[in-house]
């Protein structure tokens, strides 16, 4: 209950998954669903893919800004805020109380811990432990990023 879906969002479409056979790219079946828990908001133009073999989950009290893409099998924990134009690739797990700045990208099959902050425009290509702030490409601890830039 109390889920707000803004204009133009697409929820539950097939994910982007193909496998090559005999010089053809065949679509990988996506049989999971999207679960959106209570008190969430999904911004305009956001897309959330259904899971392939498991479900895609948006945790309670999570807010997604406009033009965000959440790929198949992604799990987002509770109380998270994700700014516009963020892309989260397939099968990544985002913890609770996570904040992701605009235009950040998160590669597939990663684990982002609880209480993590990811700066805008960052490229996350490795797991991030709990209680960490990162920024840059590749995303680094924010103190290291600021010291070197």
Where are these regions (language model features)?
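Short, small-residue-biased leader/transition segments that mark boundaries at the very start
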Residues: 2-4
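Active-site beta-loop-alpha junctions enriched in small/polar residues
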Residues: 10, 16, 45-47
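Conserved sequence/active-site signature of Rossmann-fold short-chain dehydrogenase/reductase
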Residues: 10, 123-124
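Acidic/polar low-complexity surface segments
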Residues: 12-24
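C-terminal segments of enzyme domains that contribute to small-molecule binding surfaces
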Residues: 24-49, 54-71, 75-117, 121-123, ...
């Amino acid at each position: 209950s109390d889920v707000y879906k803004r204009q133009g969002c697409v929820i539950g479409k097939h994910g982007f998954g193909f496998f090559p056979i005999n010089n053809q790219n065949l679509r990988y079946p996506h049989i999971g669903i999207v679960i959106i828990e209570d008190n969430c908001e999904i911004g305009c133009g956001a897309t959330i893919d259904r899971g392939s073999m498991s479900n895609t989950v948006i945790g309670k009290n999570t807010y997604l800004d406009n033009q965000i893409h959440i790929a198949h099998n992604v799990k987002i924990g509770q109380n998270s805020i994700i700014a516009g134009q963020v892309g989260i690739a397939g099968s990544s797990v985002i913890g609770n109380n996570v904040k992701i700045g605009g235009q950040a990208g998160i590669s597939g099959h990663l684990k982002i811990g609880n209480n993590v902050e990811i700066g805008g425009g960052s490229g996350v290509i490795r797991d991030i432990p709990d209680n960490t702030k990162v920024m840059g490409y590749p995303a680094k601890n924010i103190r290291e990023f600021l010291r070197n830039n």
